[in-house]
Amino acid sequence: MSSAALVPADDILEPTLQSILDQKSLRWIFVGGKGGVGKTTTSCSLAIQLAKVRKSVLLISTDPAHNLSDAFGQKFGKEARLVDGFDNLSAMEIDPSASMQDLLAAGGEQGEDMGFGLGGMMQDLAFSIPGVDEAMSFAEVLKQVKSLSYEVIVFDTAPTGHTLRFLQFPTVLEKGLAKLSQLSNQFGPMLNSVLGARGGLPGGQNLDEVLSKMESLRETISEVNAQFKDADLTTFVCVCIAEFLSLYETERMIQELTSYQIDTHAIVVNQLLFPGKDSTCEQCKARRKMQKKYLDEIAELYEDFNVVRMPLLVEEVRGKEKLERFSDMLVHPYQPPQE
């Protein structure tokens, strides 16, 4: 089920994310799950813990909803900036559609006319490549990562379906660039003459220069694609709640990650109720009974995973102090009252 190595039956895995903190070779950590399960809170908290043991950590949101700013109470954008109160933890929020428009406009004034003529054709061609929005988001990430040196990068990904596309796009973009290169070889001279008649591409570039840049991007993506499939460098943390649909999504996600050869060996189960044995809340007890059923299923299905059980908290986890308290429970298991 997991691409991580199986452990002996008598070896009970810790119910924490300590193994991720201890694995110093990790460079890419993805955090994903169904919407509304506490994915952003978990990714922020994991990044906080990593900042204690790594020289530099970058937290990136690829979710169009962008909740990092809300979680930390600080505005982030497409440029990496330090999180208040930290000297080695930075964050950024990437808008995939904006990244795509930036690429098409190439920063030139003529970009405003890109909806017409050849520009419109190129835009249609670009958007016809499956997963191209995530691919452009990834290209934006690569630009940042290449210009700034971070020891480990944590991705707060979009809800499940988009996450899996996000992990596919290195391959998708490689194929798309190969097709564009083939088109260039066939129609390059004709396209260059048409471009020349229209004043060329924005920024004064010719088609060959654009394709050369894209080929360079393809090589970088190919290298990162190989890193994604290396369990020493990359892992995926699944986040869920103890309900049927969330568990179903988690199982589907783990199966797909395994098919992509991406390591996953940790699950964070959020929003758990732990009513005390003297509790008079019948609704709490009923919900706990339901949650326990799914927790038992998780324990049976994922015996070779680190499964972290996190309580439902009274207040929202927002701001540095609350995130730090939440993050402590990722490495020091929550001790519930006696049931």
From Swiss-Prot:
Superkingdom field: Eukaryota
Cystine bridges: none
Entry keyword annotation includes Cytoplasm: yes
Entry annotation: catalytic residues: D63
InterPro entries linked: Anion-transp_ATPase-like_dom, ATPase_ArsA/GET3, ATPase_ArsA/GET3_euk, P-loop_NTPase
Top-level EC class as recorded in UniProt: hydrolase
A GO molecular function held by the record: ATP hydrolysis activity
EC number: 3.6.-.-
Chain sites annotated for binding Zn(2+): C281, C284
Family of the protein in this entry: Belongs to the arsA ATPase family.
NCBIfam families (UniProt xref): GET3_arsA_TRC40 (TIGR00345)
Functional description taken from the UniProt entry: ATPase required for the post-translational delivery of tail-anchored (TA) proteins to the endoplasmic reticulum. Recognizes and selectively binds the transmembrane domain of TA proteins in the cytosol. This complex then targets to the endoplasmic reticulum by membrane-bound receptors, where the tail-anchored protein is released for insertion. This process is regulated by ATP binding and hydrolysis. ATP binding drives the homodimer towards the closed dimer state, facilitating recognition of newly synthesized TA membrane proteins. ATP hydrolysis is required for insertion.
Name listed for the protein in its UniProt record: ATPase GET3
Source species: Coccidioides immitis (strain RS) (Valley fever fungus)
Lineage of source species: Eukaryota, Fungi, Dikarya, Ascomycota, Pezizomycotina
UniProt gene name: GET3
